[in-house]
């Protein structure tokens, strides 16, 4: 039975919590679509006419289900990474220690940088919907003109977000100029450590008379 270290417990909790938060956000987005988008697309579907119990169930079911699923998946993925073969377990612990040592500002900047494309995609979709809601109130423009106008607003916002992401990447590189080299060196060190450990165990097995199945099959007694 393996005794977990405090770093392993904290890393597992962090990965599970992150997966749960991502699932909750996705679930609330689905709930918002159910209550805001579907009634516009299907006028016969009117959530306002439903009872409070049904509306509550429709609202909390997607985030509850996705929170549980994503948290469980994150936990399983972490276990597979930590307790599988190879140097990935050391990489996961080193990454957790590095993240834990960062300041709140550095965590915020790195979090934005690591998820910038998700943020840009979500902001583009939100800006497209928001601009359509605003433009759709114009009684003069045709529907085609409204679509073009809403898309122009969304593209303008997306260009601004892309420029902001470039600036964010430059700022992060300025804060950590050798980050990529350090990570690459750490991976090589962990891989060498695992290789040395496997070689040591193999030598110990030979000294104690332990023979693997592959060695038994390749031995002379199995050959005609």
Curated annotation (Swiss-Prot):
Keywords linked to the UniProt accession: Membrane, Mitochondrion, Transmembrane, Transmembrane helix
Membrane topology annotation: Multi-pass membrane protein
Gene null: resulting phenotype: Increases frequency of mitochondrial genome loss.
Gene Ontology biological process terms, A to Z: mitochondrial cytochrome c oxidase assembly; positive regulation of protein-containing complex assembly
Topology feature Mitochondrial matrix, residues: 39-47, 134-142, 205-224
Domain HIG1 per the UniProt entry, residue ranges: 89-180
Mitochondrial intermembrane side: 1-13, 76-103, 174-184
InterPro entries for this protein: Hypoxia_induced_domain, Rcf2
Subcellular location: Mitochondrion membrane
Protein name in UniProt: Respiratory supercomplex factor 2, mitochondrial
Species per Swiss-Prot/TrEMBL record: Saccharomyces cerevisiae (strain ATCC 204508 / S288c) (Baker's yeast)
């Amino acid at each position: 039975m393996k005794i977990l270290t405090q770093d392993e417990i904290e890393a597992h909790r962090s990965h599970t919590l992150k997966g749960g938060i991502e699932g909750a956000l996705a679930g609330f987005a689905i709930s918002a679509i159910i209550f805001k988008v579907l009634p516009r697309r299907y006028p016969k579907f009117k959530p306002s006419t439903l009872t409070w119990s049904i509306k509550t169930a429709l609202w909390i079911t997607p985030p509850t289900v996705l929170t549980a699923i994503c948290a469980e998946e994150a936990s399983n993925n972490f276990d597979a990474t930590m307790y599988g073969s190879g140097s990935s377990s050391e990489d996961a612990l080193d990454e957790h220690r590095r993240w834990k040592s960062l300041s709140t500002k550095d965590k915020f900047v790195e979090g934005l940088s690591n998820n910038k494309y998700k943020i840009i995609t979500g902001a583009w979709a939100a800006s497209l919907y928001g601009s359509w809601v605003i433009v759709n109130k114009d009684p003069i423009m045709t529907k085609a003109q409204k679509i073009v106008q809403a898309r122009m607003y969304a593209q303008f916002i997306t260009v601004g977000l892309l420029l902001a992401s470039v600036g964010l990447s430059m700022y992060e590189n300025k804060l950590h100029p050798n980050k990529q080299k350090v990570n690459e060196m750490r991976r090589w060190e962990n891989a060498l450590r695992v290789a040395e450990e496997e070689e040591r165990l193999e030598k110990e097995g030979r000294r104690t008379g332990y023979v693997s199945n592959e060695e038994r099959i390749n031995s002379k007694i199995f050959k005609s």
